[in-house]
Amino acid sequence: MRLAIYPGTFDPLTLGHLDIVEQAAGIFDQVLVAVARSAAKVPLLDVDHRVAAATAAVAHLDNVTCAPFDGLLVDLVRERGACAVVRGVRGHGDFEIEQQMALTNRRLAGSLTTCLLIPAPEHLGIASKLVREIVAHGGDVSFLVPPAVLPFLPRQ
């Protein structure tokens, strides 16, 4: 079985994230959406709600599961026996960041494949930060997140 891990804070999971998950689900036998408990960010949703929202959004994908994680990604990869890490890339800026992370993870893990996937053009401009900003001002984000995620978002 080929397991890939798609890590992120997913605060909240967007249509762009879902696009990447769906692509990965078509490539790998199993995909784990690993929801990070990020101490560096102040989240819109706590980790349990982010996992629940992600789980609801990927319910149509039989080979995808969601779970929280702490610590180094390479430790989770070893623990789960994953063959690859999946990341989404929207543009040049994302590529440079992801390249640096992939090389660092490879050094930490000895060898680790990172699969960079590009979302559909209509999802390129979507970012969780944008969603959080709109939610904070009481705006409509239904065109940015999967319908299953909407009930988890705070109402302003």
Predicted regions and their residues:
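Nucleotidyltransferase catalytic core that binds NTPs
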Residues: 1-156
